[in-house]
């Protein structure tokens, strides 16, 4: 069987409280902290900060 990978799936949730989110993965070894990135939120039609959250 294959070894479990180092990358973990995460959810990027909009800080504009629209409920919109992106899913992606990140390398746990290179980025151990919480991930934040500015991306486009189609609900408010603006670029807003997205913060990392666990996938349920």
From Swiss-Prot:
GO terms for MF: structural constituent of ribosome
Transmembrane portions of the chain: none
GO annotation (BP), single: translation
An annotated GO cellular component: cytosolic large ribosomal subunit
Organism of provenance: Vibrio vulnificus (strain YJ016)
Alphabetical list of Pfam families matching this protein: Ribosomal_L33
UniProt keyword Ribosomal protein, yes or no: yes
Key words of the record: Ribonucleoprotein, Ribosomal protein
Family classification: Belongs to the bacterial ribosomal protein bL33 family.
UniProt-recorded name of the protein: Large ribosomal subunit protein bL33
């Amino acid at each position: 069987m294959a070894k479990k990978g180092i990358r973990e799936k995460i959810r990027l949730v909009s800080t504009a409280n629209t409920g919109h989110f992106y899913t992606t993965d990140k390398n746990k070894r290179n980025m151990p902290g919480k991930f934040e990135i500015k991306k486009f939120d189609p609900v408010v039609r603006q670029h807003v900060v997205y913060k990392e959250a666990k996938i349920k």
